[in-house]
Each structure stands twice: as structure tokens, then as C-alpha cells.
């Protein structure tokens, strides 16, 4: 008689099965909702990754988007040239054509545009001619070659090498132009998209020190963190503190994130970004500027492996794996390939976390 189930027991068992089924369904749904946090110091390429998600997963930029980026391209280009011109006096670099008064007049034309706050306007013929003469001046080129000694946008050469196209009357930004633009992220940018039957919410938060206090409320229920590091910034200092090396700042920030109690069970993906710029820079600027104990060769492979090891060494948890990728955020194919691999890791880890893998 002890083997028979009462109606009440049967109902309880059925309720239990229903609850388990519902929990499993909820778990599967939870595993499909992916919350990604993009973290990293300022100018590490986070906002470019967000733009790539728009290109790869949301059909790219509309003609309206393109129009809105026009003034940003103009401003980035002029501001870059002005940064070089101003650095020439700081670094005591003379113009190559120093005897010619015209070159100093050209510099004044460009500086006056900034003073009048007209840097978002299309280039006048006079301004375009002045910018072209300045950019080809040997002194300006020498100063550009020392850009690690002052603050200059990574996109400076990209835009200044293409002044004729940017200065044409029918100019409209290309996808690559938009990827190269730089606008400081303030606050939090949120992007939603679907991929591999998953619903992604990607959060890009400002990387400058003043912006980091805004991160905290994004921390809850994060599936994974993508931490961006600009490999090419090993010989540069911060905008906000010119006594601090940018890569050392990134290492300190990564240490804080990687070992933070909020992220004990959070997947951490490390993007060693700007590999294209790093590959060029490492040929002429020593890694010992940042890591004075480095004794390896000045080759991309050895130097990149050393940088990766420095970041991985910050991980104090034997059970936490850091998933590392070397990236070029302005290369859509590279980011598409890397994000595909990242998504597979997220799927496996998320299902495991829900007890479904």
C-alpha cells in the first residue's frame, strides 16, 4: 500500500515536472540573451567594434548616417593637422620649406579655421590647398613621425593622405571613412542585434578615467566582457595624464576587471587591437619604452606574444580562462571572423552556466 501514489502526490509530482520543464525553458531562453560589455581604456577601439557590429549584423550605414559623419571627417582631418603643426613648435621642428613665407601662412589658415570653430565645414579651396602643402612639407612629415610624443588621432595619415577626395564638392563618407572617425564616447552606447539565434545587447562605455565611474550599473548579469587594448600605444601617454603610459594604464585596468568579484563567472575576451599600427610601429620604436625588462626581438610575433603574456599574467584565478584575439577593428573581415569565434565560446560557456551543456 506504501507503493501507491495519492492523487495529491501525483499532482505534486506533475507540478514538480512542470516547474523543471519551465526552468529548463527559462534556462534556454536565458542562454539566448547575451549581454556583452565592451571595456578598455580610451581610444582602444571599442567604438569601432560597435560600428563593425552595425555593418556586419545590421546592414551597415544608411545614407543619412553617411551625411551625419561628414562634419566628423572634416573635423578629425583638420584637428589632426593642427595637432601636428602645434607639436612642431613644442618639439622645435622647423618647416622643411622654412624660407618660404607661404608655408607659415598655410599654417595660419588652418589654425584660424579652428579658432573660428569652422572645422566641421567642407574645405574651402584655399584651405584645401594650404592643407595639401602643409602635409607634404618635410618638417610636417618629420613631426608626424614623432607622433608618439604628443596626442594625435590614429586616423591622421588615413585622412590626410586622401585630401583631394575629402575636399571634393560631392564628397560623401565611405564605410571605411566612418570606421576611421574618432568621437570621444561619453556615457554608454547600447546596440542590439541577433546572430546565431542569439539576442545580443552590446554596451560600449567611455574609456577615459572620468567615464569609468559610469560602468558600474552595467555590471549586472553580464554574459561576457570584451576588453580592448590598443597594442600600438605601448610608447604613448594618456590624454588625461601625460605621465602615465597608455599600455601600463590598460594593464592596471585589465587587472581590476579580470579579478573583480562582479566578474567571477563572466567570460573575458581580450582584444589586442590595432595590430596593423603595431606591426608598423614595432619596427622603429622599442617595446622597452613600456616594458624595460623586455629582451626579445623587435618583431611583431615576439613583441605581440610578450604583450599578450603580460595581460594573461594578471589573471589570478586558475579556473578562469582569458580568450585572446589579435584584432584590427577597422578591418571588417577580421572582426567578422573573430566575433564568430567569440560567439561560439559565449554559447558554450552560457549553456554550461545554465546547466545545459
Curated annotation (Swiss-Prot):
One of its GO terms (molecular function) is metal ion binding. GO terms for cellular component: cytoplasm; heterotrimeric G-protein complex. A lipid is attached at residue 3 (S-palmitoyl cysteine). Coiled coil: none annotated. It comes from the Eukaryota. G proteins are composed of 3 units; alpha, beta and gamma. The alpha chain contains the guanine nucleotide binding site. This is Guanine nucleotide-binding protein G(o) subunit alpha. It comes from Mizuhopecten yessoensis (Japanese scallop). The gene is SCGOA.
